[in-house]
């Protein structure tokens, strides 16, 4: 078993790392300033500037693996990207996680990544041309509407949103929440999951349908803050769908295939999120160590107190273990497929956030009262 990185893996990871350290990190204060000015729900200029720079450098659309193990509905519209494997991209995603807005710079931010995968695997040529191409070019944003306030949405078969066919249209009624990205003024299209046939088998009742956000009957009711943070300019919204009509051509893959699409979509996304979470943890650990070395108490640096030595050691152990598990899951997805890797994918979904929360919490404690302020970025990371 060889744990060394290949030349290609190192090449792409290092390109992303170097771009972030040279371009993104030096502009982080500019980002925070622009984010705080005026309307919360806006396009942030420095992000657009960095996107253009990354695109020109060819560090763009890194997330799309060359194959999912399933034939595509359409192969006439190609995806423009380097075709990194899940493992190769996982290493890049960790670097992006170190600064919260970095993934958007490379056009690799959720939910667009998962939605582009849906279009690529399951979309028709027309659906790809209309929606995937502008997403691929970084011109628009998108949303994925599955979770509902009235049911336990971790079980996707509970979804209650109604999708009733009337002639050449579907009429959609329901309420979604935690609809990430809807607050962005560039968000133009949503993939909505609902039920088209309540009499079908349990996992064949659901469908996924494309709903333009400017369609009559789409109403953004409110934004949902997370621990008091609005996560602007993307946000998480509650969206009401009231008698929304869309053409039948907007259904993806066909009626009754929604659960199947959801399963195919969520696997790669968990690799992305978990590896970015490792980046968040690494950043928190670095801030913690810097703080502990810069402060003294009882005649020695705080870092020299045994409790902090233990916490730092535990943080390093937990990060290394989590990274290995994530990379194993990514490797399995590339070599044996997402279905066989389901166990590992489920494990990282639990391990990565638990690991990061503990390290961020320790970093907050190391900063004292400053840890819960906005000065160090730890409260928002938590």
Question: Language-model features: where?
Answer:
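N-terminal glycine-rich flavin-associated loop
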Residues: 104-126, 155
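A short core secondary-structure module
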Residues: 168-169, 173-221
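Alpha-helical interface subdomain recognition
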Residues: 1-100, 109, 122-127, 134-139, ...
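A short, Trp-centered hydrophobic/proline-enriched beta-strand micro-motif
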Residues: 138-147, 192
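Flexible, small-/acidic-enriched active-site or ligand-binding loops
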Residues: 158, 216-245
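Short glycine/proline-enriched turns and hinge-like loops at secondary-structure junctions
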Residues: 84, 154-157, 182-187, 201-205, ...
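Cytochrome P450 core scaffold surrounding the K-helix E-X-X-R motif
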Residues: 153, 220, 250-255
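Glycine-rich phosphate/pyrophosphate-binding beta-alpha loops
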Residues: 152, 177-184, 268-272
């Amino acid at each position: 078993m060889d744990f060394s990185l290949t030349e290609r893996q190192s090449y792409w990871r290092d390109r992303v790392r170097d771009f972030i350290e040279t371009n993104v990190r030096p502009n982080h204060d500019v980002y925070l300033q622009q984010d705080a000015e005026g309307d919360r729900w806006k396009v942030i200029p420095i992000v657009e500037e960095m996107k253009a720079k990354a695109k020109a450098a060819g560090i763009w659309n890194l997330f799309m693996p060359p194959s999912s193990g399933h034939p595509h509905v359409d192969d006439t519209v190609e995806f423009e990207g380097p075709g990194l494997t899940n493992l190769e991209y996982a290493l890049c995603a960790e670097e992006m996680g170190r600064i919260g807005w970095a993934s958007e710079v490379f056009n690799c931010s959720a939910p667009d990544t998962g939605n582009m995968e849906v279009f690529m695997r399951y979309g028709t040529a027309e659906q790809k041309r209309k929606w995937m191409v502008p997403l691929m070019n970084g011109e628009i944003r998108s949303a994925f509407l599955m979770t509902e306030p009235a049911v336990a949405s971790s079980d996707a078969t509970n979804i209650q949103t109604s999708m009733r066919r009337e002639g050449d249209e579907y009429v959609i009624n329901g309420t979604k929440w935690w609809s990430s990205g809807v607050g962005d003024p560039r968000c133009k299209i949503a993939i909505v999951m609902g039920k088209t046939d309540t009499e079908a088998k349990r996992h064949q009742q659901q469908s996924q349908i494309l709903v333009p956000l400017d369609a009559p009957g789409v109403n953004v009711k409110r934004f949902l803050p997370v621990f008091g943070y609005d996560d602007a300019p993307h946000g998480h919204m509650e969206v009401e769908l009231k008698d929304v009509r869309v053409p039948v051509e907007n259904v993806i893959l066909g009626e009754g295939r929604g659960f199947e699409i959801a399963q195919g979509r969520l696997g790669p996304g968990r690799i992305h999120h978990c590896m970015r979470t490792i980046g968040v943890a690494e950043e928190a650990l670095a801030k913690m160590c810097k703080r502990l070395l810069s402060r003294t108490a009882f005649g020695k640096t705080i870092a020299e107190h045994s409790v902090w030595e233990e916490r730092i050691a535990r943080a390093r152990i937990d990060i290394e273990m989590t990274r290995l598990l994530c990379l194993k899951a990514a490797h399995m997805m590339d070599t044996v497929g997402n279905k066989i890797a389901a166990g590992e994918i489920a494990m990282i979904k639990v391990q990565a956030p638990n690991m990061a929360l503990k390290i961020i919490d320790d970093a907050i404690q190391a900063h004292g009262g400053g840890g819960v302020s906005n000065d160090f970025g730890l409260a928002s990371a938590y």
